[in-house]
Amino acid sequence: MFAFFDEDLTVLDFSLFKNVVSIEIGDKSFTYVKTVCIAELPKLESVRIGFHSFFHADEYDGTQTADCHFYAYDCPELKELIIGSDSFVYYSRFVVKNLPSLEEIMIGDSVYCSQCFTYASLELKGEGMEHEVKNRLSKAENTQDWCGLFQEVRTSAD
């Protein structure tokens, strides 16, 4: 069963919900959304997205949906960003910026062959992000999983 299977809903912008503390999206949700924006939420602490969400109808025939983007930025209290397997498969951009409290990003499932953000570049922006990413990847048990996750990994302090 798909939730929010509405062709007219193409942008999901949470920035108006300034008092939200947690965002939880279930499995198989938001089929036609092409842009997800989680931005400027001063109280947000947790984002959890289920498996097979943001999976476009175009993807069923194996074609890439153009210009699909995920943004999470300027949420000073965000501690965790967890995305289930096979979500955002054909998204072309994944940007995480200025999340000073971020402790955990979990994308996909280590047991199941995940296909999250298969066609995206990973952009981590903000003070200290480059250092943190390099340190955490060097300590990862299986860096091969990370290497295949994104087409390109970029970090910067801007």
Q: What residue spans do the PLM features occupy?
A:
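Leucine-rich solenoid repeat scaffolds
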Residues: 94-96, 102-158
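Inter-repeat linker/turn residues at the boundaries of leucine-rich repeats
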Residues: 7, 15-18, 28-31, 39-42, ...
